[in-house]
Curated annotation (Swiss-Prot):
Pfam families: PEPCK_ATP (PF01293)
Name of the gene encoding the protein in the UniProt record: pckA
Organism: Bacillus subtilis (strain 168)
Domain of life: Bacteria
Top-level EC class: lyase
Protein name (record): Phosphoenolpyruvate carboxykinase (ATP)
Functional pathway: Carbohydrate biosynthesis; gluconeogenesis
Amino acid sequence: MNSVDLTADLQALLTCPNVRHNLSAAQLTEKVLSRNEGILTSTGAVRATTGAYTGRSPKDKFIVEEESTKNKIDWGPVNQPISEEAFERLYTKVVSYLKERDELFVFEGFAGADEKYRLPITVVNEFAWHNLFARQLFIRPEGNDKKTVEQPFTILSAPHFKADPKTDGTHSETFIIVSFEKRTILIGGTEYAGEMKKSIFSIMNFLLPERDILSMHCSANVGEKGDVALFFGLSGTGKTTLSADADRKLIGDDEHGWSDTGVFNIEGGCYAKCIHLSEEKEPQIFNAIRFGSVLENVVVDEDTREANYDDSFYTENTRAAYPIHMINNIVTPSMAGHPSAIVFLTADAFGVLPPISKLTKEQAMYHFLSGYTSKLAGTERGVTSPETTFSTCFGSPFLPLPAHVYAEMLGKKIDEHGADVFLVNTGWTGGGYGTGERMKLSYTRAMVKAAIEGKLEDAEMITDDIFGLHIPAHVPGVPDHILQPENTWTNKEEYKEKAVYLANEFKENFKKFAHTDAIAQAGGPLV
């Protein structure tokens, strides 16, 4: 089968009488309810559940091994190859399956707020609630949007279609398969809506660097003077909390590109975690959950239809999807200039990284590649001890290219635009987990504020002798003694032992990167 046949198949599918094109949020909400796909909550949002899969399925994600891309992809456990033949067989099956549905829902929009670099996308859904999710998460076309001649990337989403690993070349009945040559993503066997969002992000992480644009898994905001700040950080580091700032406007909460003219949001909406969400702690997210929003796997009271954000009955990974304009404090369109400050957030449960340090370009590249945080792992006896977690470029599951490509682009951007880079530890102080305490949020906010407002540019710096980090001697609103982690530990020997242990974990993790010896030497720990 050749690509002409695939295109013809797709056109035949899109013109089927059962296809509903570009329905409004209200129309899709009606469809969700009439088709019993979800319920309406007390605030007017749609709530859907996703069955067995309440998160991504990384082991079921593949990239088609094609002539034009096979020498560019960083093949391995994240980017698993699948043959063109297997893809085309599955494609035919999925298209046939979708044609037989009573109704299909199609959204046509974009990824990328900057018109120069936007990618047209077409999302074909078996479920109306998935189409509402896509409509609210991606960029919705406006009346004056020019028709693009570029062929769209198409998502074919068939959650109730299940693959047969014996004949289809998959690992299970679930599959997420990207073909760059056919500009197609096949998703089947999972109802988790986040697969659509992250598949488009993975594609942009391949396409944007080819145009000399750094694609980034980060949030971004801008101050009144046009000063842009980027926030990188893995789950639990405080990225959402710290980038939602009443004095600054949100550019985006999760995915961005950095071009020659500045930063732009890749999406048109937000996909916020909502476990333990409260109006007091995160009013912007809480108040965005209204008519047109989608709640995923959130427990809702049968009678009052009120959401219970503290209940993790379905999963800890409860989510809300809503268009970005449901937040008041935003930039429109979602673009701004070059960043003046970049913040890497980590939650170090060993309690040995400083609460804030300023990084050289090489250190920035090193810590970007490392993508460190720690998580607390339970044991049978209920005792918890920290575990190191490294996620390359703070977004390892979504990077099709070798890691050094992104790190070198970051280094180049820092050189060209003079951004200051900071490593901020939102984790433990005065000892590790169990003996120390979590860094006070008010202190972290004060440190981040000082960093992004340029107040640390001329600060006196003290160089840490284990990690080589440059720690400010003073930060407005923060007690001086907590800035040096060793000062907060009663047992200095134990501090040193734990710090050297973590430094060695960094070095061990860094061995996996090719073409990075110079970065490791200039940016890594000193011990």
